Amino acid sequence: MKRLVLETTAPFQGLPELVAFDEGLFQREGLQVEWADREPATAKMIQANLTSPSEVDPFASHGRLFEQGQADMYNACEWGNYCRVQATGKSGRQVGRRAIVTYSALVVAPHSPVFTPQQLANRVIGVPFYFGTHYIALHMLEGFLPRHEIKLCSAPNGSRYRLAALLSGEVDAVTLTEPHITLAEKKGCRTISSAFFHGTE
């Protein structure tokens, strides 16, 4: 049986792999899949002083264990993986689009004065640089605002951390994925814009 070590994934981006693992589908195909946990080393807080992707490591989360030789494969957003493939030290490459399309939303806190994308001009938006939710924030806002009025800062990987930062008032808006979009709405937050994006393996 061939052994394959995958970096851990989340349901919003890797549900097919998680189901295949739980249902024994990999084993039926002769693959012994193991998971390498990338979560413990990832940042969990807003870094408002970091306002550009050039100020952070593209391998801070996705691809980190692959680059260290501790995983054979990982999935992440297509745009971030273009950057990672360019910066790889291990001849990493994209082998194809992942089997799931991700839904993302730009969300504000319950008492925010923001109701439209235009009102986010010069307000701090927390995004995880090199992630799909970073690039989709730009796509969602550039139709409404000139680029110099879009103010991004480094936010943690993981919607739960970004939602907590939003609710505590650390940022004016964040990008989220499910199930945290629904959780945010249940807490009174408002979705300002939403869109879908691809990822790759």
Predicted segments, located by residue:
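Pocket-lining segment of extracytoplasmic ligand-binding domains
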Residues: 161-201
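Short, glycine-/small- and polar/acidic-enriched structural segments
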Residues: 2-145, 149, 153, 172, ...
